[in-house]
């Protein structure tokens, strides 16, 4: 007796449906994709019990014709592709022809649609079988009503979460579609109550309405870049804002939400010099790429994508973010977001509609812009005045530490640490401050313009050395005896191989001498005596951006050379660190950690009830 047999057609469809439809939010995603692909400018969403009981979508798209309606629920029927060539240039959100058939198998679905606006037809399908096809009163667009979800998938239904959790998952899907399609009006109804309306608006305004309350001072920076077949639009929080989780890093490729580790790494890598380890930036990335250079057909829910040239894209994103925060702020427009919402969950906040708002013309109203653009000028030398607050100054006593003293001398006598000040700095200009003293052998206390600064001595010295290293003139130093090293991790080996030519631009010459084996032949003069540090960088390489390696290398050298906690500093050297701190306008150490804490005279008076 044969053990291998053909599966029943209905069973095959149930298995296929289980792969793409795992919970109500999956159904919602597929239906929204269809509405968006239909060219709809208005989409109404009705959810009951987190989508478990009912999902109803109404759109004003081009609709489905009578004959197409009869077959639209069958497996692998689609209007979006017709040949293998079409797979290479997909521009629609859906394309496989699986969505409606999978939904029809695991629920009861009713579709009413019209292409003319004069007459419409309705088809009702239960368990993948047509039950009714009839003429209906005229509508403009399509209505899809899904009920009894997973009634014939008892195991799947048993593992659904409680209503609030399923609702939250559906709202996340809605958020993804709302943010990527600002040209569409969305109306959201939960359990037969109107919850939120998003009007047609610009992408900037849509980001405001969806994410505007994420950062306290409501300021986003907008970075736009174009390169051949790639268009980048980034919404970045100011450098002093970060989160403990990655959930506020969101990436969208051709209007699809993508969970791609490489894109996440590119964004975090670009922020690595301003955000401390363990924290993550607030960033929303929108990529538009020629469809011929990407492949979305790699994940059942299209959450991943293959890029034609991922290393280049990684570098483009990372370097542009890095350069963005390096440049003067007056080179960019700062978008000021006015906080409108007070509820943590924007999507479920009740909307306060004007009394005269007519439901029939809601979508003809375009919301007033709530963004204003400010051009902020980075004035590096204003308000530098000395004030005496009467605190007792004391002179720090340097202990008898010859090796430490010698280290300080070497740092600032080496020629490669000399660098020119930026042209807009006045070298003769004296930075006025009142040095109070050193506390806990760790912090320097300074008074300047009615403010008190507590400065981390190690971090500020580390940053000063780091900046001198970055701006120094470098020369190539050939090693008398090349240093051999091994790369064990295959992924790291691939990264090193792809970047060997780039290392040459940094005056770092390495050669591959066998499988997983390399030798270091030349290094920049500033890396002298730090060859082992460089080898460690190669062996633990995770980033694809050369600038990151260079920055991390300099940060490591600076960390080794900088003064440490418990080092007692002389008065002269302390003043030097403070002068450089104000002159370079230092805010973060090379690892992204904050260098100082500041409190104003007014705040201090408030603490002691004098204000």
Swiss-Prot record:
<dbReference type="InterPro" id="IPR037198">
    <property type="entry name" value="MutL_C_sf"/>
</dbReference>
<dbReference type="Pfam" id="PF01119">
    <property type="entry name" value="DNA_mis_repair"/>
</dbReference>
<dbReference type="Pfam" id="PF08676">
    <property type="entry name" value="MutL_C"/>
</dbReference>
<dbReference type="Pfam" id="PF13589">
    <property type="entry name" value="HATPase_c_3"/>
</dbReference>
<dbReference type="InterPro" id="IPR014762">
    <property type="entry name" value="DNA_mismatch_repair_CS"/>
</dbReference>
<dbReference type="GO" id="GO:0006298">
    <property type="term" value="P:mismatch repair"/>
</dbReference>
<keyword id="KW-0234">DNA repair</keyword>
<dbReference type="GO" id="GO:0030983">
    <property type="term" value="F:mismatched DNA binding"/>
</dbReference>
<comment type="function">
    <text>This protein is involved in the repair of mismatches in DNA. It is required for dam-dependent methyl-directed DNA mismatch repair. May act as a 'molecular matchmaker', a protein that promotes the formation of a stable complex between two or more DNA-binding proteins in an ATP-dependent manner without itself being part of a final effector complex.</text>
</comment>
<dbReference type="GO" id="GO:0005524">
    <property type="term" value="F:ATP binding"/>
</dbReference>
<keyword id="KW-0227">DNA damage</keyword>
<dbReference type="GO" id="GO:0032300">
    <property type="term" value="C:mismatch repair complex"/>
</dbReference>
<dbReference type="InterPro" id="IPR042121">
    <property type="entry name" value="MutL_C_regsub"/>
</dbReference>
<dbReference type="InterPro" id="IPR020568">
    <property type="entry name" value="Ribosomal_Su5_D2-typ_SF"/>
</dbReference>
<dbReference type="InterPro" id="IPR020667">
    <property type="entry name" value="DNA_mismatch_repair_MutL"/>
</dbReference>
<dbReference type="InterPro" id="IPR036890">
    <property type="entry name" value="HATPase_C_sf"/>
</dbReference>
<dbReference type="GO" id="GO:0016887">
    <property type="term" value="F:ATP hydrolysis activity"/>
</dbReference>
<dbReference type="InterPro" id="IPR002099">
    <property type="entry name" value="MutL/Mlh/PMS"/>
</dbReference>
<comment type="similarity">
    <text>Belongs to the DNA mismatch repair MutL/HexB family.</text>
</comment>
<dbReference type="InterPro" id="IPR013507">
    <property type="entry name" value="DNA_mismatch_S5_2-like"/>
</dbReference>
<dbReference type="GO" id="GO:0140664">
    <property type="term" value="F:ATP-dependent DNA damage sensor activity"/>
</dbReference>
<dbReference type="InterPro" id="IPR042120">
    <property type="entry name" value="MutL_C_dimsub"/>
</dbReference>
<protein>
    <recommendedName>
        <fullName>DNA mismatch repair protein MutL</fullName>
    </recommendedName>
</protein>
<dbReference type="InterPro" id="IPR014721">
    <property type="entry name" value="Ribsml_uS5_D2-typ_fold_subgr"/>
</dbReference>
<dbReference type="InterPro" id="IPR014790">
    <property type="entry name" value="MutL_C"/>
</dbReference>
<dbReference type="InterPro" id="IPR038973">
    <property type="entry name" value="MutL/Mlh/Pms-like"/>
</dbReference>
């Amino acid at each position: 007796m044969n053990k291998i047999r053909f599966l029943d057609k209905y069973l095959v469809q149930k298995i296929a449906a289980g792969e793409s439809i795992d919970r109500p939010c999956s159904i919602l995603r597929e239906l929204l994709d269809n509405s968006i692909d239909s060219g709809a400018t208005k989409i109404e969403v009705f959810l009951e019990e987190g989508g478990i009981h009912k999902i109803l979508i109404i759109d004003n798209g081009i609709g489905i014709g009578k004959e197409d309606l009869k077959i639209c629920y069958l497996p692998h029927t689609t209007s979006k592709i017709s040949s293998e060539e079409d797979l290479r240039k997909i521009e629609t959100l859906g394309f496989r022809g699986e969505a409606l058939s999978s939904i029809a198998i695991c629920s009861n679905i009713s579709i009413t649609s019209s292409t003319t606006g004069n007459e419409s037809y309705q088809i009702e399908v239960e368990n993948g079988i047509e039950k009714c096809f009839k003429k209906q009163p005229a509508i403009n667009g399509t209505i899809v009503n899904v009920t009894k979800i997973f009634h014939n998938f008892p195991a799947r239904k048993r593992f659904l979460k409680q209503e609030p959790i399923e609702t939250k998952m559906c709202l996340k899907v809605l958020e993804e579609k709302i943010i990527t399609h600002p040209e569409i009006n969305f109306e959201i109804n939960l359990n037969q109550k109107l919850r939120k309306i998003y009007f047609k608006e610009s992408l900037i305004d849509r980001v405001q309405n969806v994410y505007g309350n994420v950062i306290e001072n409501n300021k986003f920076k907008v970075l736009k870049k174009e390169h051949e077949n790639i268009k980048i639009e980034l919404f970045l929080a100011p450098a002093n804002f970060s989160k403990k989780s990655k959930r506020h890093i969101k990436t969208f490729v051709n209007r699809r939400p993508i969970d791609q580790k490489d894109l996440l790494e590119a964004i975090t890598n670009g922020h690595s010099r301003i955000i401390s380890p363990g924290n993550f930036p607030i960033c929303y990335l929108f990529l538009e790429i020629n469809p011929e250079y990407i492949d979305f057909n790699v994940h059942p829910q299209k959450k991943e994508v293959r890029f034609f040239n991922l290393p280049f894209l990684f570098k483009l994103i990372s370097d542009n973010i890095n350069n963005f925060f390096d440049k003067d702020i007056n080179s960019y427009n700062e978008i000021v977001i006015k906080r409108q919402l007070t509820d943590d969950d924007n999507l479920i906040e009740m909307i306060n509609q004007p009394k005269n708002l007519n439901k029939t013309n809601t979508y003809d109203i375009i919301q007033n812009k709530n963004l204003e653009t400010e051009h902020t000028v980075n004035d590096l030398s204003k308000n530098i005045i000395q004030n005496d607050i009467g605190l007792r100054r004391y002179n720090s006593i340097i202990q008898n530490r010859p090796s430490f003293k010698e280290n300080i001398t070497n740092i600032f006598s080496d020629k490669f640490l000399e660098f020119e000040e930026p042209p807009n700095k006045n070298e003769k200009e004296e930075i006025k401050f009142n040095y109070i003293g050193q506390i806990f052998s760790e912090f320097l206390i300074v008074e300047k313009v009615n403010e008190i600064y507590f400065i981390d001595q190690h971090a500020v010295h580390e940053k000063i050395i780091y900046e001198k290293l970055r701006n120094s003139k470098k020369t190539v130093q050939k090693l008398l005896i090349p240093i051999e090293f091994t790369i064990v991790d295959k992924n790291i080996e691939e990264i090193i191989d792809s970047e060997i030519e780039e290392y040459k631009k940094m005056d770092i010459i390495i050669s591959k001498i066998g499988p997983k084996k390399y030798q270091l032949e030349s290094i920049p003069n500033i890396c002298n005596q730090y060859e082992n540090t460089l080898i460690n960088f190669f062996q633990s390489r995770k980033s694809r951006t050369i600038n990151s390696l260079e920055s991390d290398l300099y940060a490591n050298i600076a960390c080794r050379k900088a003064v440490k906690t418990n080092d007692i500093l002389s008065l002269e050297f302390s003043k030097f660190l403070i002068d450089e701190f104000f002159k370079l306008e230092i805010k973060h150490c090379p690892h992204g950690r904050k260098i100082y804490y500041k409190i104003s005279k007014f705040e201090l008076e408030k603490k002691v009830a004098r204000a």
